[in-house]
């Protein structure tokens, strides 16, 4: 039914405090601000986006609170102390060294590798997959696109996919306000471009930055005026 971060190592706690949580909060704050600006001016939009706003806001508040709690309770130092005790216990016995001697170094090295990509991964998830609604809708058509690309597509399968996607699209556009999504797209792409390391950005983003001379509003306008998903 759920998951927990209770058993994170000190390196995991450090990454949450310094990288992952701040990124989630920053990105979601931007999404909420964009929604707020439109919802305050229209009861219809406010009703359309009430559930979406609450969904984004819930985890925004969660990660703000988690970060405050981790700092206030000094969780990082407590984790370090536990790991030091574990390390000392291991080093008291040759058999333990053989069984567990590499445990903490392996975890530490794994986090050293993960931490290099943690910010980019969070932006990919929060500003990409969970960012503009247009991207999630387009992604739901991948299965149909893959089937149609086959040498001999399964027509029965295609028919079922089309029916399912039509129902999904009808529900999607019922609570969709294009100006919010257009502004969100521009903002998310801008944040991704500014905050993620150059060597971890997708090639297409660099091409779009060059094509639209760094104007993400123009980039968003071009996408939304041409896309079949808007």
Regions found by a protein language model. Give the residues of each.
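Terminal presequence/propeptide segments associated with secretion/organelle targeting
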Residues: 1-230
């Amino acid at each position: 039914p759920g998951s927990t971060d209770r058993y994170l190592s000190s390196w995991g706690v450090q990454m949450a405090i310094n990288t992952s949580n701040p990124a989630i909060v920053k990105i979601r704050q931007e999404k909420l601000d964009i929604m707020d600006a439109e919802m305050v001016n229209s009861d219809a939009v406010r009703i359309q986006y009430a559930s979406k706003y609450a969904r984004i806001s819930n985890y925004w508040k969660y990660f703000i609170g988690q970060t405050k709690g981790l700092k206030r309770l000094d969780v990082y130092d407590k984790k370090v102390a536990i790991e030091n005790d574990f390390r000392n216990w291991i080093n008291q016995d040759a058999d333990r060294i053989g069984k567990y001697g590499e445990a903490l170094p392996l975890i530490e090295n794994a986090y050293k590798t993960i931490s290099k990509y943690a910010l980019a991964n969070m932006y990919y998830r929060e500003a990409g997959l969970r960012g503009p609604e247009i991207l999630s809708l387009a992604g739901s058509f991948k299965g149909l696109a893959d089937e149609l690309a086959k040498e001999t597509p399964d027509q029965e399968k295609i028919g079922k996919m089309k029916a399912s996607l039509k129902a999904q699209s009808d529900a999607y556009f019922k609570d969709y306000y294009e100006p919010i999504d257009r502004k969100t797209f521009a903002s998310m792409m801008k944040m991704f471009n500014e905050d993620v390391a150059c060597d971890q950005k997708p090639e297409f983003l660099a091409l779009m930055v060059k094509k639209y001379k760094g104007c993400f509003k123009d980039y968003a306008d071009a996408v939304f005026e041409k896309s079949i998903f808007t």
